[in-house]
Structures are given as C-alpha cells and as structure tokens.
Amino acid sequence: MEVVEAAAQLQTLKFGGSGPGSAASPPPEERPDAEQAEQAPPAGEQPPPAPSSDAGENPPPPSGPCATAPDAAEPLPELQDSDSSDSDSDSETDSDSSSSSSSSSSSSSSCGSLPPVLSDGEEDVQVEKENKNFPLKTKDELLLNELPSVEELTVTLPEDIALKPLGKVSSIIEQLVIIESMTNIPPVNEDTVIFKSDRQAAGKIFEIFGPVAHPFYVLRFNSSEHIESKGIKIKDTMYFAPSMKDFTQYIFTEKLKQDRGSDASWKNDQEPPPEALDFSDDEKEKEAKQRKKSQIQGRKKLKSELNESGEDFGEVHQNWNANSSSEHSKGYHNREFTRGFPRGRYSRGSHGRPPPQQYYNSDPMASQESLGFPPQRQDNPVMPHYPFPPPMFDMHNFPLPPPPPPPPTVSMGWAAPSMTSHPVLNLPYSLPPPPLPPPPPPPSPGESNSSHFGSYY
C-alpha cells in the first residue's frame, strides 16, 4: 500500500508542477536564491497553480515586479525540494517495484519448478527411463532379475586335459556375455561349462541363438560386477573341454533337422504346440505332401474301381435282359400265321381232320369269311419283338394252352368271338399275349381226304 500511495503522490506533484516556471527553475543546491528570483518569470506570465494541497496553503502573492520577485522566489526551493524528494521516492518505488517484480518472478519460477514443463525430447527420455524400470514382457515370461542367482563355479582343469577354443567374446550387455563361435567347431548345447585361458571356469551356457553352423552362446551372471570379478573382457577367447563329458554336451544337428519347428508365435507370444508346428526341412515337407497326395490318389482310384464294377454289373444285367427277351421272342418269331393256321407244335391236331375240298379256296380271306371267321391281318405276319419279358411270369417255361377242340360237324355258324379266353392269359401286364390261332374248319361228312393240307405243312 505504501508503494501505491507514493505513486499517487508522485502523479499529483507532477501534475501541479508541470508549468514552465517549475521546469525552468534549477535545483536549489546549485544556484542562490537571488539568481532564482532574477530568473523567475513575471507574475503575469505564470499560469495559475493547479489545485493541490500545497497551493491551497500558500496562496500566490499580489502582482508587482518588486514585491513579488523576492516573495515568489521563496516557495520555489520548497517546490524543487519536493520535486527532488519525489524523484528520489519515485526511483525508490521503481527499484522497489523492480525488486518486487524480480521477487515475484523468482517466486513464480520456484513455484513452476514443482510441475516442470517438458519438451517432446525430454518426455521421450523420461518415458524410456520409466520403461527401463517397468520393461514389457509376455504373460509367462521371466525377466533376468526374476531368475534365480547363478551359482559360482570354482572348477579348474588340470594340465593334462585338452582345451579347444570355442569362440570370442563379442559383446557384454549388463549381466550377459555374448560369445561368437568359431568356424568348423561342433556346436555345444546349453549347460556346457566354458573356460578361460587360465583353465578356470567362466560359467555355463545360458542360451544359444543364431544359425546352427555358426551359433552364438550367452553366459549369464548375477551382475556386471560379477563379470568384472571374473576378468572377462571383449575379444577374449573362450574354451571348452571336448573330452570331458561332464562339462561338454554336443548338439546333434542331423536330429535337429528332422525335428519340426516354426518361427510363428502362438498365444501370449509363446512357442506353438507340437500339433501346430511346420516342417523345418523342405525335403521332409515335400515327402509328406507326396505321401498325402498318394493317399488321395488311392482313394480316387478305389472309388473309380467301385464305379466301374457297378457299371459292369449294370451291363451284365442289361445283357441278361436282352438275352432273355431274345429267347422269349424266339418262341414267337418263327410262328407265322398263314391262312389262319399255325405251324409247329400246334399243327399236329389238325392233320387228322382236314377240311373238305369244297371249303378250300385259294383265297384265304374268302375262305375265312365264308366260314364265319374274322379276317386275319397279313400285313405283319411275324410277331413283334419285345425287349423284355412280361414281369409276372417267365414265358420260357410256361407252356401255352393247347388250341380248343374243333366244333362238331353240324354247327358251322359259330364265330371266333364266342370263344372263351384262357384265364391265365388275361393277367394284367403291360404287354398283351400273342393271339390264339383260329380253329380249323369243320370237315365235310362226305370227304375225308386230307391231301389238300400237305402243301401248307
């Protein structure tokens, strides 16, 4: 509040002493009062003083060159003193305000240091530091610090046991030592003991990665200080004892080639199960595909053979039907109906009773019409060929009924429609039976010569 009041007074004083007389008056320390009085402008030229507390207390003197000059010069030193004091206070207030502003800026900077504002690069560095504290891992993965501590090996090989170089230390990463194997060296398996040049054990192989012909071996230690205590450095040559079966375990590469492997990950970034693995060898994969293809071809061949056997069976059945139909038609193919009389097996009964000569006529149709028989069609005397036998019975073994006996000699006017058909021939089947032969005409009582029928049989 003091600073604000001082600033208000300074504004008031500046407004009151803004006239030309106050600006032209020198400070009292450098000039005497007489000079100030001589240099003071006349009273008529001075502007009226501003309304202030000082002006109210000291009214201006009456006008006059002699009386006003010394009297008017008297309040000027006080005004200059007040102006100088005001300027001093103004400088003090400015210094105070600058100090207060600097203190406020320092306080604001001290307050802003609690939540620092970081740039993008600083944020990335901070995130990386946090990730180092909390590394990413899968569901069942174990970190190095979660593994049990490595046991200390105090094995020293005697001089009579041969050592063979395995590889050189390529890098050291925290608590891991990476060894790059040499060429033409059989690969060794995990838990193989690795020795230094002084025949002391360096550690056991923790993990193997890289190609089979040129693998990389990893030695795990408890910390980086543990590695330094062992005296292991980059480019150091590491050895193994090939003759010691307790310390050295080999990897059989041929067996590895036969195993199935996959580079794909499975659930939770784990290794896939055996049933989901792919072949690691192209030849084995090709052989398996060929075997599967042969199985499919065998199935197709068996199916085609079954289809062919079914077709053969259908062909045999069709041939049997054709043979049976041809044999069935043989019984009727050679039976010709000439002049209404049959040949073959049914002509025996007609030899004993030939018709008389007077009823014989060269025209068979006229003779049949004269006897009252229906005319016989001659356009197709041969029976039609049926491809299949009737379904109800076999016509080969079923005998046809014998022809009806001839009518008596007296009755000559009966006709063929009065004949009763055989009950067996009226069975319901699709193909009609062959028509019955007409009966022979009755013989004449005066003639018994049967030579007329010799030419027909």
UniProtKB/Swiss-Prot annotation:
Low complexity bias locations: 96-110
Biased composition (Basic and acidic residues): 261-270, 327-338
One of the GO biological process terms: box H/ACA snoRNP assembly
Keyword match DNA damage: no
Ranges of biased composition (kind: Polar residues): 358-370, 446-457
Domain of life: Eukaryota
KW Phosphoprotein (keyword) present: yes
Covalent cross-link Glycyl lysine isopeptide (Lys-Gly) (interchain with G-Cter in SUMO2) as placed by the record, residue numbers: 303
Biased composition range(s): Basic residues: 289-302
Family the UniProt entry places it in: Belongs to the NAF1 family.
Name under which the protein is recorded: H/ACA ribonucleoprotein complex non-core subunit NAF1
